[in-house]
Amino acid sequence: MKLHELRAAEGANKASKRVGRGTGSGLGKTSGRGQNGQNSRSGGGVRPGFEGGQMPLYRRLPKRGFKNIFAKEYAAINLDRLNCFEDGTVVTPELLVEKRVVKKVKDGVKILGNGNIEKKLTVKAAKFSKSAIEKIEAAGGKVEVI
């Protein structure tokens, strides 16, 4: 086989559909768009959500609520996720991101009390649940609010 003998695989190169080139082609006159009207025109059709003049669904339904721009969003972590650290480690939000325990520290980290902790850790975070504080201190660790 030589370079000039190479051919594309069967069906790899599909010829473009040539429309509006005579009735004998089967796609002449209306070019496969049916009879004339809004949808047969270039750029024709209605905008998304338009229901033919009827009040559209997105306007029939009431608006509700608002976005509180002062809301704090904390990255929540349960205690059992902290067992991946060695005894005596100082666990900070930066370390949690580095070890991929949490993807992103938003407005801080909140430690929740689900699961058990077997390691003696010093945990620094923005918020703690009451049960998390009890369990960390029961394991011999320390809690620091930053």
From Swiss-Prot:
Question: Which InterPro entries does this chain map to?
Answer: Ribosomal_uL15 (IPR030878), Ribosomal_uL15/eL18 (IPR021131), Ribosomal_uL15/eL18_sf (IPR036227), Ribosomal_uL15_bac-type (IPR005749), Ribosomal_uL15_CS (IPR001196)
Entry keywords, A to Z:
Ribonucleoprotein, Ribosomal protein, RNA-binding, rRNA-binding
What gene makes this protein?
A: rplO
NCBIfam families annotated for this entry? Answer: rplO_bact (TIGR01071)
Which residue ranges have biased composition labelled Gly residues? 21-35, 42-52
- Among its keywords, does the record have Transferase? no
Q: Which GO terms describe its molecular function?
A: rRNA binding; structural constituent of ribosome
Q: Which family does it belong to?
A: Belongs to the universal ribosomal protein uL15 family.
Record the organism. Answer: Clostridium botulinum (strain Okra / Type B1)
Where are the annotated segments for Disordered? Answer: 1-56
Q: What is this protein called?
A: Large ribosomal subunit protein uL15
Ribosomal protein found in the keyword field: yes
| A GO BP annotation | translation
Q: Which purpose does this protein serve, as stated in its record?
A: Binds to the 23S rRNA.
Q: What is this organism's lineage?
A: Bacteria, Bacillati, Bacillota, Clostridia, Eubacteriales
Short name of one Pfam family: Ribosomal_L27A
Q: How does it assemble?
A: Part of the 50S ribosomal subunit.
Q: Which PROSITE patterns match?
A: RIBOSOMAL_L15 (PS00475)
Q: Which GO terms describe its cellular component?
A: cytosolic large ribosomal subunit
Enumerate the PANTHER family for this protein: 50S RIBOSOMAL PROTEIN L15, LARGE RIBOSOMAL SUBUNIT PROTEIN UL15M
